[in-house]
């Protein structure tokens, strides 16, 4: 998809390199809720917190995305997630509509009836 649209996807183990010139910065939590073996996890992600210093290397019009819930102060700072560049609330709302549409499709179409016949 990226090559057909003229886009590119880039990953890096260097946080500054990863965001340099980026139009979108997308992160997730470093440690899942209820995860027991967290020793060393924060060390492994050192330098990857999305903060004002890091996003200064991105495109000035960058968008910040996070699948939520965010652990403020861990993977992202308040300044970034609450900034005008953050689209996390729109992202969450769009996810809700997509999930509702999928449920509607499954409940009102042959996909649901086919599943019920398999039981």
Regions found by a protein language model. Name each.
Residues 1-119:
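Structural/interface elements that position substrates and couple domains in central-metabolism enzymes
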């Amino acid at each position: 998809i990226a090559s057909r649209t003229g886009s590119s996807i880039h990953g890096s183990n260097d946080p500054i390199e990863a965001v340099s010139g980026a139009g979108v910065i997308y992160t997730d939590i470093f440690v899942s809720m209820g995860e027991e073996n967290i020793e060393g996890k924060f060390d492994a992600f050192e330098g990857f917190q999305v903060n004002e210093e890091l996003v200064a290397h991105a495109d000035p019009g960058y968008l910040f995305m996070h699948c939520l819930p965010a652990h403020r102060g861990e993977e992202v700072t308040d300044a970034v997630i609450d900034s005008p560049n953050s689209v996390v609330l729109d992202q969450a709302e769009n996810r809700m509509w997509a999930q509702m549409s999928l449920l509607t499709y499954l409940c009102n179409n042959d996909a649901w009836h086919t599943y019920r016949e398999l039981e």
